[in-house]
Swiss-Prot record:
Single annotated GO MF: cysteine-type peptidase activity
Annotated gene: CASP7
Impact after mutating R187 to W/N: Strongly reduced thiol protease catalytic efficiency
Protein's name according to its UniProt entry: Caspase-7
Source lineage: Eukaryota, Metazoa, Chordata, Craniata, Vertebrata
Species assigned in the record: Homo sapiens
Phenotype upon changing C290 to T/N: Does not significantly affect thiol protease catalytic activity
């Protein structure tokens, strides 16, 4: 059971600002590994501008009164019965995400330490709001997790139960609009050792075409890690995934398409972060985010 910390925490043991940890249920009680994320020197080079024609037919319409709502659920503290430790560093993630998504134009609201029922209620109510004048919707979940589930402060809830409120048959005012979910949580307990590297056309035959939209269409899920693996977090700096996501969005959030943005996030997490620990089991581990897209068009946050 994990999320984004670089160490498995012992109950009652506090993280130092330099430790990375994985949000997992403690199962190695004999140690708390000392970890830090090692970032390669960040050489910011303005990438050579590649001009690519945008084809409106294949882009989401962003010409709305507002960009949309962004809900951030930031779970840091957990009931003792869950066996989960405090997610030190998650407040840095929440703060960075709030600033980043607000600068993109989202109306951002942060909720802290939510129970499973509270998370369900928040998202159900959000799905029942009128999004007619909004271009899209975003939700960011910061918590402990396992594959397919995420922790509220009092236990686990299926991620699908949270996102299903926004299906096309349940949230009509977001039909054919992008629904974005960013999930910073572990998806298992496997560790990535890494490996050394050498360095269609629209059918417009009908004047007023009628068509059905799959209820699961227009969703995007950006996970901090692949299925089965830990996700790392630094109590001093925040999670690797969120650090990279905010950095790329600040640089290119208004000029790159969402999949280009998330591909760069993948690259940054994969190349710029690595754990170090006195315990060989947690030494020099890597992480790669995972994107699952059911988007049907290209998404640019600027018109």
């Amino acid at each position: 059971m994990a999320d984004d910390q670089g160490c498995i925490e012992e109950q009652g043991v506090e993280d130092s600002a330099n430790e990375d940890s994985v949000d997992a249920k403690p199962d190695r009680s004999s140690f708390v590994p000392s970890l830090f994320s090692k970032k390669k020197k960040n050489v910011t080079m303005r990438s050579i501008k590649t001009t690519r024609d945008r084809v409106p037919t294949y882009q989401y319409n962003m010409n709305f009164e507002k960009l949309g709502k962004c809900i951030i659920i930031n779970n840091k503290n957990f009931d003792k019965v869950t066996g989960m430790g405090v997610r030190n560093g998650t407040d840095k993630d929440a703060e960075a995400l709030f600033k980043c998504f607000r600068s993109l134009g989202f109306d951002v609201i942060v909720y802290n330490d939510c129970s499973c029922a509270k998370m369900q209620d928040l998202l159900k109510k959000a799905s029942e709001e009128d999004h007619t004048n909004a271009a899209c919707f975003a939700c960011i979940l910061l918590s402990h997790g396992e594959e397919n589930v995420i922790y509220g402060k009092d236990g686990v809830t299926p991620i699908k139960d949270l996102t299903a409120h926004f299906r096309g048959d349940r949230c009509k005012t977001l039909l054919e609009k992008p629904k974005l979910f960013f999930i910073q949580a572990c998806r298992g307990t496997e560790l990535d050792d890494g490996i050394q590297a050498d360095s269609g056309p629209i059918n417009d035959t009908d004047a007023n075409p009628r068509y059905k939209i799959p209820v699961e269409a227009d969703f995007l899920f950006a996970y901090s890690t692949v299925p089965g693996y830990y996700s790392w977090r630094s109590p001093g700096r925040g999670s690797w995934f969120v650090q990279a996501l905010c950095s790329i969005l600040e640089e290119h959030g208004k000029d790159l398409e969402i999949m280009q943005i998330l591909t760069r996030v993948n690259d940054r997490v994969a190349r710029h972060f690595e754990s170090q620990s006195d315990d060989p089991h947690f030494h020099e581990k890597k992480q790669i985010p995972c994107v699952v897209s059911m988007l049907t068009k290209e998404l640019y946050f600027s018109q």
